[in-house]
């Protein structure tokens, strides 16, 4: 089973990413489960998302404490210890950043396999917005191959109509531009 945990700030529409990835996996004949949880403090509100995908029925129904994959929609969230907590030793972290993987390793002491993508720039260039959900989904698909990239296109078109094409284009660009660096030993 592939277990993924997403971290975002409120308003980044991370819930849509969780839902779309879950629906795409189901459309591909896999078992999938996805849900989100909001947490708020006096300073700011954040959202965590959880996705499980498997070839077998999923009987768990809990938050994911030890994910195979952590997806961070806002690099500033890495300053919070709980964001990377529990990542499996063979785990992968995908991050929205303009920094190279080695810069992330130096800044945050991350030893996991890293996938980095400039999702903010892609969203601005293609969508004219700061909505990073489509580019981050492209990065997730590149790193995990959990579903074919094309599995998202009909879902985006169905949900967003004509704007779905631009969202799929952002997803495709992120898929191509995501840089993966294997974990450090």
Spell out what each predicted region is.
Residues 1-185:
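Active-site cofactor/cluster-binding pocket
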